[in-house]
UniProtKB/Swiss-Prot annotation:
It comes from the Eukaryota. The lineage of its organism: Eukaryota, Viridiplantae, Streptophyta, Embryophyta, Tracheophyta. Involved in cyanogenesis, the release of HCN from cyanogenic glycosides in injured tissues; the release of toxic HCN is believed to play a central role in the defense mechanism of plants against herbivores and microbial attack. Decomposes a variety of cyanohydrins (alpha-hydroxynitriles) into HCN and the corresponding aldehydes or ketones; two natural substrates are 2-hydroxy-2-methylpropanenitrile (acetone cyanohydrin) and 2-hydroxy-2-methylbutanenitrile (2-butanone cyanohydrin), but in vitro can also act on 2-hydroxy-2-methylpentanenitrile (2-pentanone cyanohydrin) and mandelonitrile. It comes from Manihot esculenta (Cassava). Changing S80A: Loss of catalytic activity. Exact pH optimum pH is difficult to determine due to the fact that acetone cyanohydrin is very unstable above pH 6.5 but HNL activity was found to rise from pH 3.5 to pH 5.4. The pH of the cell sap of damages cassava leaves was found to be 5.3. Homotetramer. The keyword Lyase applies. This is (S)-hydroxynitrile lyase. The gene is HNL. It is an enzyme of class 4 (lyase). Acetone binds at T11, S80, C81. Residues 5-242 form the AB hydrolase-1 domain.
Length: 258
């Protein structure tokens, strides 16, 4: 079996803690694993009101790739909204990325605005239940909407089949976050030369209660990945509810692309 260096990227409002089950599962198989907190996430000391864009939010990933030794490549695994982090990183450091893995994730394309899949997600799932919304003005004068994910949303739509302990952990450590949708809408498209050229693997389940099946099928049809894996059962957090299945898939990704 081939071993690889996996870099695990959480979604907005979360942190590296979301990978606490998958990281050791991959390490037991001999892989190197780095789980990063994005800006104003997890234990990163910044507040979301200090972050001006999704690119700035991605800074820890970009800094990590910048420092990666020349010739070394990683497989980036992004959950949920972290597909955007993968795209941003691939446009800057395409030579350092062996593949991008989209885990029940946004799958942006290179044809439309970077906000396109966000807009489609919000059309598919417009009511974020008991989520609270706030606004602030960023450095360029844009009004940024932030959110604190509601506990009902977390339990019924994200951590649907997770244990009570995993749900309680999420409630305790969840932070405010943002999709930076209006800033993404003005951002240049992702490039064919960068993001468009990396290998893309899509992992999903039709039991996801926020990235609904029709939305995920639409994404796959819109920007066809190199490989698609459909996991049976689970929920939005496959890394928690189907840990071994995801680890097995990632081994196949390593065998193919590392």
């Amino acid at each position: 079996m081939v071993t690889a260096h996996f870099v695990l990227i959480h979604t907005i409002c979360h942190g590296a803690w979301i990978w606490h089950k998958l990281k050791p599962a991959l390490e037991r198989a001999g892989h190197k694993v780095t789980a990063l907190d994005m800006a104003a996430s997890g234990i990163d000391p910044r507040q979301i009101e200090q972050i001006n864009s999704f690119d700035e939010y991605s800074e820890p990933l970009l800094t990590f790739l910048e420092k990666l030794p020349q010739g070394e490549k990683v497989i980036i695994v992004g959950e949920s909204c972290a597909g955007l982090n993968i795209a941003i990183a691939a446009d800057r450091y395409v030579d350092k990325i062996a593949a991008g893995v989209f885990h029940n994730s946004l799958l942006p394309d290179t044809v439309h605005s970077p906000s396109y899949t966000v807009e489609k997600l919000l059309e598919s799932f417009p009511d974020w239940r008991d989520t609270e919304y706030f606004t602030f003005t960023n450095i360029t004068g844009e009004t940024i909407t932030t959110m604190k994910l509601g506990f009902v949303l977390l339990r019924e739509n994200l951590f649907t089949k997770c244990t009570d302990g995993e749900y309680e952990l999420a409630k305790m450590v969840m932070r405010k976050g943002s999709l930076f949708q209006n800033v993404l809408a003005q951002r240049p498209k992702f490039t064919e030369k960068g993001y468009g050229s990396i290998k893309k693997v899509y992992i999903w389940t039709d039991q996801d209660k926020i990235f609904l099946p029709d939305f995920q099928r639409w994404q796959i049809a819109n920007y066809k990945p190199d490989k698609v894996y459909q996991v049976q059962g689970g929920d939005h957090k496959l890394q928690l509810t189907k840990t071994e299945e995801v680890a097995h898939i990632l081994q196949e990704v390593a065998d193919a692309y590392a």
